[in-house]
Amino acid sequence: YAYRLNMKKKFEDFIKKYLPGWAILPLLTIVVLNCLIYWGSDQLTSARYHYDFTGTLDRMVPLVPAFIWIYILAFPFWAVNYILAAQRGKDQFYRFVATDLTIHLTCFVIFLILPTTNVRPEITGNSWSEQMLQFVYAMDGGNSPSNLFPSIHCYVSWLSWRSVHKSEKIPEWYQHFSLIFAILIIISTQV
């Protein structure tokens, strides 16, 4: 029982230190709005023509299934960095949230006006990476993906880096890591 109480206390201390109460509702709003925009725009445009944005570069770049792990790790990376954004103080955090919500709503309008798709490369192997890639493809529209332009993965990754960049409260090594990981996430959307 004492162990559970100690763990609960550590968790509460962690939350107090990294996630101020005033940041919880804005962060939940971002999560809910992201889901509504992503799946809502998909539903609203499902019967409409989707413009194929598969370009020459897309056809030239080979599929690298191992990058699916970077793509998946984007989700906890975003969560951590969005929480760390609160370390910059209330005013800067609210500006960060306003930027995120503005970009999300802009994406929503673009998704509705210009529904897009692309041709996904065929997955021929059966490695763990290829199986995970097939799973993600199935979760994300199968052979008919949508909401591809602009890329929410790319902008959220960039914004995640910006949330910690030049922050006195975030270690410099983590700021550099965030930049590198954000770039890897952006690459993962291409390969």
Regions found by a protein language model. Give the residues of each.
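Short helix-capping/hinge motifs at transmembrane helix termini and TM-loop junctions
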Residues: 46, 114-118
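Juxtamembrane loop-transmembrane helix junctions in multi-pass integral membrane proteins
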Residues: 14-17, 58-65, 88-91, 140, ...
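Membrane-interface interhelical connector segments
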Residues: 118-142
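Interfacial segments of alpha-helical transmembrane regions
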Residues: 80-113
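Membrane-embedded catalytic cores of phosphoryl/pyrophosphoryl-handling enzymes
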Residues: 135-191
